[in-house]
Amino acid sequence: RDLRMSRGLGDVYKRQYYRDMVKKLIVFLFVAGMGIGSLSAQLAKTCFTNMPDSLSPLLTAVNRADFIDFLESKMKAEVTNRFGGKSEMTELTPDYIRVQVTPQSTWQMKLLSVNDSTRLICTVSTVCAPACDSYIKFYTTGWEELPAASYLASLPNMDDFIVPASDTVDVYRYQDARLQADMLLMKADLSGKDATLTFTFTTPDYMEKEAAEKLKPFLRDPIIYTWKEGKFNN
């Protein structure tokens, strides 16, 4: 339509029209050449909005699109989910998303580079009832599931979170508390700032309060895995 309209313009207006078009083209080429990062910045939200409904039972396609629109408009990104509850996207970066799906559950995704040309998606689903426990999965950017063992060789075990007793007095306290820590629970968190995965020991949250207090002096700090050479390593 613009071309048809331009035919009826005088030469002066034609020249101005084409100058404007050239300026826009130059700006576009500059952005395309220098702004590769800004193009890749669209990828996290694009992957999220394109996620199959089968992988997002509580959030509809409209919910997911609304999250993005609200945050980009500097608004609180809260929606009514498929079951009538409230869900909120709390973080959105070029390669990371975090959603408070329900008051007791969260969902995170992170785009990770496998090599110079390939990225994959890592997701962490966490449910707290009341102790938190997480499930980690990996997908292609087209949401085809990948074998987790290829990208996360091993998970921390109970002994990774607990320091052995150092003296005879501690041994009895340690053994008593350790026997009650009979189920490994841990919360995993992806980072929006770097390519790390942090595991926090949550077994004490389900134990009796007295036993949890006895175990507390023997607990190690959260364990951090770093994404390197296409997999998470401790």
Locations of regions flagged by a protein language model:
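Acidic/hydrophobic-patterned starts of short beta strands in beta-sheet-rich repeat architectures
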Residues: 116-126, 194-200
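Short, small-residue-biased leader/transition segments that mark boundaries at the very start
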Residues: 1-13
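Mid-length scaffold segments of soluble, non-membrane domains
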Residues: 120-154
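Short aromatic loop motif centered on NTY/YTY
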Residues: 148-227, 233
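Short consensus segments that form the blades of beta-propeller domains
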Residues: 99-100, 126-132, 211-216
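Bacterial Sec-dependent N-terminal signal peptides
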Residues: 14-47
